[in-house]
Amino acid sequence: MAAKSEAMDTLVSLAKRRGLVYPSSEIYGGLRASWDYGPLGVELKNNVKRQWWRAMVQEREDIVGLDSCVILAREVWEASGHVDAFVDPLTECQSCHKRFRADHLTEAYEAKHGKPPANGLADLNCPHCGAKGAFTEPRMFSGLLRTYVGPVQDESGLAFLRPETAQGIFINYKNVEQSSRRKIPFGIAQIGKSFRNEITPGNFIFRTREFEQMEVEFFVRPGTDEEWHQYWIDTRLQWYIDLGINKDNLRLYEHPKEKLSHYSKRTVDIEYRFNFAGSEWGELEGIANRTDYDLSTHSKRSGTDLSYFDQETNTRFIPYVIEPSAGVDRTMLTFLLDAYTEDEAPNAKGKMEKRVVMRLDPRLAPVKAAVLPLSRNADLSPKARDLAAKLRKRWNVEFDDAGAIGRRYRRQDEIGTPFCVTIDFDTLEDNAVTVRERDSMAQERISIDQVEQYLAERLAGC
């Protein structure tokens, strides 16, 4: 496999060509760091969300789901601290006039040199033009995207597109606790779109202004928060490993106390070795101990009692919150980068050729099986279509009869399809088909009547 820095360009090209991800608004010149998900991309993205929801909600008795609004009352963001504190340091190169986040520039320098720049931005070269010491003094820039609600665009109608899904959970905490009759410890999960006016979006779908989050707010008794925090760090790390991410490409990063968010007692990031230009590691998921900051703040600001009464101990308290927060888009990028493999396989003439394989866990693969008649034939194609239609009732299945069978295998390898089922002329005589496994390319001959059961045994959890 190529180095990940090289693989990124290859992956972007493959993503567009194979219908995973397209540049948004492309026919009008595009919009920076905006991407649309194509037919295969939306399947992969939905599979990522499905596996997360299954692990975090459906397989647990202590977490329930929620779907809150994208636009919340402005007071929510004032109370949470976002209006005042959701800001980033903006600096501009006076040579090329490109703008950057000052903290990202210094962090990249520190990652490369092992120490912060002695003279701050004055020691740094512009990533775009190379000019040294040409940066302006940083000024704070709000990451909130504004909109207006109602017929008049004035201060009275000012609202914000949510920068995170978490606040929608906090303001519904009491509703969920009472209606679902949950007892501490319990959690509320949500998947949804968020928006941030990023200064320097980029690295494909890693950092965008519109993105999707998968978050849980897990409410615990004060004093048990540190134990629960470690539990969620371990649990979330294992989720990625169980779905096929090479553990050597994962690490935990402890936020220094001086860099913690205003609400955090402790934050640990799960990082992946993306090998971006200037930065080997990038945040995949953050797990934060938010203490009682959010519920206390909203309780005080709204006048609503958000405390919890424990009947067993006859005590009342504001719960602490542990928050595992992941981005759907960068999680998808991680699975794609880690699965992308190049090896060699013989072509129809026996000559070895490069083969691109997306070694995705079958639970994530956009297409679970492809049904391929050996050739486009009046006898083979209808039989193959019938089998594909039958399998499609259980999984996402492709039918393809265009081109040489070897090229069709390669197309399916490239998008990560775990199994290809080939209908050939012998099938007309013995009612058997050939099933080819993606990674090993091993082939097995089975009865056409056994294909569904054969796949079901190998696609468990899909």
Curated annotation (Swiss-Prot):
<dbReference type="InterPro" id="IPR006195">
    <property type="entry name" value="aa-tRNA-synth_II"/>
</dbReference>
<feature type="binding site">
    <location>
        <begin position="196"/>
        <end position="198"/>
    </location>
    <ligand>
        <name>ATP</name>
    </ligand>
</feature>
<keyword id="KW-0030">Aminoacyl-tRNA synthetase</keyword>
<dbReference type="InterPro" id="IPR022961">
    <property type="entry name" value="Gly_tRNA_ligase_bac"/>
</dbReference>
<dbReference type="InterPro" id="IPR027031">
    <property type="entry name" value="Gly-tRNA_synthase/POLG2"/>
</dbReference>
<feature type="binding site">
    <location>
        <begin position="327"/>
        <end position="330"/>
    </location>
    <ligand>
        <name>ATP</name>
    </ligand>
</feature>
<dbReference type="InterPro" id="IPR002314">
    <property type="entry name" value="aa-tRNA-synt_IIb"/>
</dbReference>
<keyword id="KW-0648">Protein biosynthesis</keyword>
<feature type="binding site">
    <location>
        <begin position="211"/>
        <end position="215"/>
    </location>
    <ligand>
        <name>substrate</name>
    </ligand>
</feature>
<feature type="binding site">
    <location>
        <begin position="283"/>
        <end position="284"/>
    </location>
    <ligand>
        <name>ATP</name>
    </ligand>
</feature>
<dbReference type="InterPro" id="IPR004154">
    <property type="entry name" value="Anticodon-bd"/>
</dbReference>
<dbReference type="GO" id="GO:0004820">
    <property type="term" value="F:glycine-tRNA ligase activity"/>
</dbReference>
<dbReference type="Pfam" id="PF03129">
    <property type="entry name" value="HGTP_anticodon"/>
</dbReference>
<dbReference type="Pfam" id="PF00587">
    <property type="entry name" value="tRNA-synt_2b"/>
</dbReference>
<keyword id="KW-0547">Nucleotide-binding</keyword>
<keyword id="KW-0963">Cytoplasm</keyword>
<dbReference type="GO" id="GO:0005737">
    <property type="term" value="C:cytoplasm"/>
</dbReference>
<protein>
    <recommendedName>
        <fullName>Glycine--tRNA ligase</fullName>
        <ecNumber>6.1.1.14</ecNumber>
    </recommendedName>
</protein>
<feature type="binding site">
    <location>
        <position position="101"/>
    </location>
    <ligand>
        <name>substrate</name>
    </ligand>
</feature>
<dbReference type="InterPro" id="IPR033731">
    <property type="entry name" value="GlyRS-like_core"/>
</dbReference>
<dbReference type="GO" id="GO:0006426">
    <property type="term" value="P:glycyl-tRNA aminoacylation"/>
</dbReference>
<comment type="function">
    <text>Catalyzes the attachment of glycine to tRNA(Gly).</text>
</comment>
<keyword id="KW-0436">Ligase</keyword>
<dbReference type="GO" id="GO:0005524">
    <property type="term" value="F:ATP binding"/>
</dbReference>
<feature type="binding site">
    <location>
        <begin position="206"/>
        <end position="211"/>
    </location>
    <ligand>
        <name>ATP</name>
    </ligand>
</feature>
<dbReference type="InterPro" id="IPR002315">
    <property type="entry name" value="tRNA-synt_gly"/>
</dbReference>
<comment type="similarity">
    <text>Belongs to the class-II aminoacyl-tRNA synthetase family.</text>
</comment>
<dbReference type="GO" id="GO:0046983">
    <property type="term" value="F:protein dimerization activity"/>
</dbReference>
<dbReference type="InterPro" id="IPR036621">
    <property type="entry name" value="Anticodon-bd_dom_sf"/>
</dbReference>
<keyword id="KW-0067">ATP-binding</keyword>
<comment type="subunit">
    <text>Homodimer.</text>
</comment>
<feature type="binding site">
    <location>
        <position position="164"/>
    </location>
    <ligand>
        <name>substrate</name>
    </ligand>
</feature>
<dbReference type="InterPro" id="IPR045864">
    <property type="entry name" value="aa-tRNA-synth_II/BPL/LPL"/>
</dbReference>
<feature type="binding site">
    <location>
        <begin position="323"/>
        <end position="327"/>
    </location>
    <ligand>
        <name>substrate</name>
    </ligand>
</feature>
